[in-house]
């Protein structure tokens, strides 16, 4: 099997296309709920996980399996599981590790939806999220205890764009027998970063973003590195070392070895909680994967050019992008990111003279710049082929209090830009006309 990313994104999971019933070169859409057993014995064997095959599409589907194998290959993982959304991927990834009374340790530099999920929803499940402000490896270790079941990071923090020191954090976590879970959404399916290469144990994605790439489909992925030694920690992770109450006494460590985790998540959590990815979504995401490297390359190139242009603009007070030497995590970005520095940046606009921003916060120059863009779309997504903008303080992080917003790196003047693959001069021209419209001849 070819190993280059550009080839893997086209062929992994479908190395022998002639194997399907009608020799279709495109991945077929298996729009079926269920699969016919050869006989009763065969059905029994499938339900007992004694032979490979398909039972019911809430557990497994041939179209989705191609997507799973392809993303696992691109990430350098052993296996993957496709689910209904990025939030579902995070939920199952953590619930496969932590139970009532357990805790996870996470950076505070998070997407607002993740922060809220960890802080509120996981608490209802009896799982405590302990937030470390920033990504200093030593700060994580300070809050570990015997019930810590995972460390959680984002490859490129949203919206601060910090790049954690993976190797140091992984070393500290593994010293305590704790697996590391990394949301690699901003790593674009492994194009900008492969966290498993640096020791991460489990990778999650909102496949909605760069993997799909066209703003058409919601989906999530969990990738298992297959490298964490679950057998070495039977008391810490009894769900793998003891007979499974929910699957006729199966001991996952014995039955599935290095794949114990991902099989457990599929056969029990996906089965019981139900956030499956439907085959139509898998098919659409596969269309995106086939051009992933081509799009991601352009996203990265355009983002760097726009960031450098914004740095020189008289209307801009600051720019945050890990590809800039001025960024606090630039050295980590150079170490851990490849093929570019990602497709998203943030910046702040200088104050508008005489704006009544205390009475009406939407009079802030940043909000007005967003409202006056014509090419870029003001919406809550990233990773689309088209340029997208948003003011996170008023939207994606709105549910956080002011202290939590600051801890996440969100300020009132922040504009987040998911840079598209349009011609860069057109993107720049759109921001320039918006600046000129908002300031209308006034000096910033």
Swiss-Prot record:
Record note on disruption phenotype: Loss of viability due to toxic accumulation of hydrogen sulfide, resembling methionine auxotrophy; cells can survive when grown at high density and at lower temperatures, simultaneous knockout of HSU1 exacerbates the effect. Increases expression of genes involved in sulfur assimilation, cysteine metabolism and methionine metabolism.
EC class name: transferase
Principal subcellular localisation of the protein: cytoplasm
PROSITE patterns from the UniProt entry: CYS_MET_METAB_PP
Coiled coil location: none
Phosphoserine PTM sites in chain numbering: 44
Any single Gene Ontology cellular-component annotation: cytoplasm
Localization of this protein: Cytoplasm
Subunit structure, as described in the record: Homotetramer.
Designated name of the protein: Homocysteine/cysteine synthase
Source organism phylogeny: Eukaryota, Fungi, Dikarya, Ascomycota, Saccharomycotina
């Amino acid at each position: 099997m070819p190993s280059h990313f550009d080839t893997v994104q086209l062929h992994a999971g479908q190395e022998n296309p002639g194997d399907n019933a009608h020799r279709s070169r495109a991945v077929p859409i298996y729009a079926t709920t269920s699969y016919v057993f050869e006989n009763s014995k065969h059905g029994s064997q499938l339900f007992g996980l004694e032979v490979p095959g398909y039972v019911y599409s809430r557990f497994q589907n041939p179209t989705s399996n191609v997507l799973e194998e392809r993303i696992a290959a691109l990430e350098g993982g052993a296996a993957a599981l496709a689910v209904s959304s990025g939030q579902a991927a995070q939920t199952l990834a953590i619930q496969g590790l932590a139970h009532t009374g357990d805790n996870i340790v996470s950076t505070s530099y998070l997407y607002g939806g993740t922060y809220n999920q960890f802080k509120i929803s996981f608490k209802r499940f009896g799982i405590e999220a302990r937030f470390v402000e920033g990504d200093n490896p030593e700060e994580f270790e300070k809050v570990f205890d015997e019930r810590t079941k995972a460390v959680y990071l984002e490859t490129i923090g949203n919206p601060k764009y910090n790049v954690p020191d993976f190797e140091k954090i992984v070393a500290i976590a593994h010293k305590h027998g704790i697996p590391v879970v990394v949301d690699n959404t901003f790593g674009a399916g492994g194009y900008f970063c492969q966290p498993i290469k640096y020791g991460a144990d489990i990778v999650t994605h909102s496949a909605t973003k760069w993997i799909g790439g066209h703003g058409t489909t919601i989906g999530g992925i969990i990738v298992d590195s297959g490298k964490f030694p679950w057998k070495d920690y039977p008391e810490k992770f009894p769900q793998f070392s003891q007979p499974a109450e929910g699957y006729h006494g199966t001991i996952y460590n014995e039955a599935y070895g290095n794949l114990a985790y991902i099989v457990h998540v599929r056969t029990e959590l996906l089965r019981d909680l139900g956030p499956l990815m439907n085959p139509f979504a898998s098919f659409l995401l596969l269309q995106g994967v086939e051009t992933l490297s081509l799009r991601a390359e352009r996203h990265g190139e355009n983002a760097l050019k726009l960031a450098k242009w914004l740095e020189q603009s008289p209307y801009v007070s600051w720019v945050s992008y890990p590809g800039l030497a001025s960024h606090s995590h630039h050295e980590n970005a150079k170490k851990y990111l490849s093929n570019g520095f990602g497709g998203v940046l943030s910046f702040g606009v200088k104050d508008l003279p005489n704006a009544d921003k205390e009475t009406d916060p939407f009079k802030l120059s940043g909000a007005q710049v967003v409202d006056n863009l014509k090419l870029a779309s003001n919406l809550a997504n990233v990773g689309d082929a088209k340029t997208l903008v948003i003011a996170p303080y008023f939207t994606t992080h709105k549910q956080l209090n002011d202290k939590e917003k600051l801890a996440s790196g969100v300020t009132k003047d922040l504009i987040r830009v998911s840079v598209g693959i349009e011609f860069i001069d057109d993107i720049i021209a759109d921001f320039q006309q918006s600046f000129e419209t908002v300031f209308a001849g006034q000096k910033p």
